[in-house]
UniProtKB/Swiss-Prot annotation:
Origin organism lineage: Bacteria, Pseudomonadati, Pseudomonadota, Gammaproteobacteria, Alteromonadales
InterPro entries linked to this entry: A_deaminase (IPR028893), A_deaminase_dom (IPR001365), Ado/ade_deaminase (IPR006330), Metal_Hydrolase (IPR032466)
Active site: E200 (proton donor)
Annotated site, Important for catalytic activity, chain positions: H221
SUPFAM superfamilies: Metallo-dependent hydrolases
Cofactor(s) recorded in Swiss-Prot or TrEMBL: Zn(2+)
Keywords, sorted A to Z: Hydrolase, Metal-binding, Nucleotide metabolism, Zinc
Gene3D superfamilies per the UniProt record, alphabetical: Metal-dependent hydrolases
GO cellular component labels: cytosol
UniProt name for this protein: Adenosine deaminase
Family: Belongs to the metallo-dependent hydrolases superfamily. Adenosine and AMP deaminases family. Adenosine deaminase subfamily.
Binding residues annotated for substrate, in chain numbering: H14, D16, G170, D279
One function term, GO molecular function aspect: zinc ion binding
Cystine bridges: none
Length: 331
């Protein structure tokens, strides 16, 4: 199912959406934070999706528990370290871990730049212990507004040498991308790549805006592109990468079933699209789950799965020499 001659990558993976249940339990008790359950087993349903069905509201409540226990910078560093470990344990050769320092800082009023530094330190520590290639993507959480996003961006750009890209995430309908054009001019001036969550809650126009005004060369989710034939043609012709997250889309009710997911529509249109986990801690999945699910639930052949694997490597925010090195390591 997984082609072992092709690097296995996960490019849309939220570091702050992948906190182990045991870590939430440990940090909650360490910092005297009231948890919603009295046992580790009882905690799991409050922080992870149980079964296939969910809603965006239920999903986000679980996600909030992942950052509710980040009471100090050591906790942030631990979570970053464990994200590297989890990426390696799940069999990934390369992962891009994205994080919103404002979101991670807000519950316990941590310094935003301190959170950025703690994430970088945790990842560096993880890379000493685990054999996996990792890059970081900074997130601006649009739901907190323009001013908060500018604070977040400045904290991230102070450490831009440790980032490969910036992302825009959060409430796509309430905070459209046009509110952040000035922010992304700073990102482009800093020389970072750009991805954006778009076409998930809003329509194709949100994706056009992200590409034409923000400068995005990759789009997170993008499921609503299929309603705009011109956009689909543009995506294919310009090799705009679509970071597809089928299980997450099901869990947030972006799609109602795997069979309804537009992954195959994108592939048949020649769009560059790859498989990703999104918030693997909340969804209780790993990357192999996504490949297995696409095969079993959506009828993809092994050849099509291999193409998805290759697409992921092509879409990665790495140099051609780094891409070659990933392939060479699989030979």
């Amino acid at each position: 199912m997984i082609d072992t001659s092709i690097p296995l990558v996960d490019l849309h993976r939220h570091l702050d959406g992948n906190v182990r249940v045991e870590t939430i339990w440990d940090l909650g008790h360490q910092h005297n934070i009231a948890l919603p359950a009295d046992t580790l087993e009882g905690l799991a349903p409050f922080v992870q999706i149980q079964g296939k069905e969910s809603s965006l509201v239920a999903f986000l409540k679980k996600l909030d528990w992942m950052v509710a226990v980040l009471a100090d910078l050591d906790a942030v560093k631990r979570v970053a370290y464990e994200n590297v470990a989890d990426a390696a344990i799940s069999g990934l050769d390369y992962a891009e871990l994205r994080f919103s320092p404002y979101y991670m800082a807000m519950n316990h009023k941590l310094p935003i730049e301190g959170v950025v530094e703690a994430v970088i330190d945790g990842v560096k520590a993880g890379l000493k212990d685990y054999e996996v290639k990792i890059n970081l993507i900074g997130i601006m959480s649009r739901s907190f507004g323009q001013d908060a996003c500018m604070q977040e961006l400045e904290a991230l750009l102070a450490h831009k040498q440790h980032l490969v890209a910036m992302d825009l995430a959060g409430d796509e309908l309430g905070f459209p991308g046009a509110l952040f054009n000035d922010h992304f001019k700073k990102v482009r001036d800093a020389g970072l790549a750009i991805t954006a969550h778009a076409g998930e809650a809003a329509g194709a126009e949100s994706m056009w805006q992200a590409i034409q005004e923000l400068g995005a060369t990759r789009i997170g989710h993008g499921v609503n592109a299929i309603h705009d034939p011109k956009l689909m043609e543009y995506l294919a012709a310009n090799r705009i990468g679509i970071e597809s997250c089928p299980t997450s889309n099901l869990h947030t009710s972006t799609v109602t079933s795997y069979q309804e997911h537009p992954l195959r529509t994108f592939m048949e249109a020649g769009v560059l699209i790859g498989l990703n986990t999104d918030d693997p801690g909340v969804s209780a999945i790993d990357i192999k789950h996504e490949y297995r699910t696409v095969k079993q639930e959506m009828g993809f052949s092994d050849a099509e799965l291999a193409q998805l694997q290759r697409n992921g490597v092509e879409m990665a925010f790495i140099s051609d020499s780094e891409r070659k090195a990933l392939y060479a390591a699989k030979a």
